[in-house]
Amino acid sequence: MGVSYGQNLMGLEATIAAFRECEPWRIRLMEQIAANHRFLKAAFEKNMPECKVLQAEATYFAWIDLRALDIRPAQLTYLLEQETQIVVENGFRLGKGGAGFIRFNLATSQENLQEGTKRLIAFCKRHCKH
């Protein structure tokens, strides 16, 4: 698929410590990611209903359907980065059914999420097919 992931010893040790000793932190993190997903979904439903934020499935990425945009899937992330300075994962790289979708990182502060959502929705409005 062209996606590679690596890990390092420090990251591995931090992950082990987080799961063994940081339950309150993990709970707050998961609550914040869920709140960020609700915020993003509501913003799209209100301001850009042609594009859909799908139900979360146990990850800190939102899966967003941008097939309503007049952009070829292969060009989507390039244009998004050039016009908004937002870097996302292009869904077509994750398999055939992902064309026209993006993965948007929710593991961020509320301030970053609000600014990114504003830019993403403005981009979608500029490129919507109708």
Region locations from a protein language model:
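PLP-dependent class I/II
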Residues: 1-130
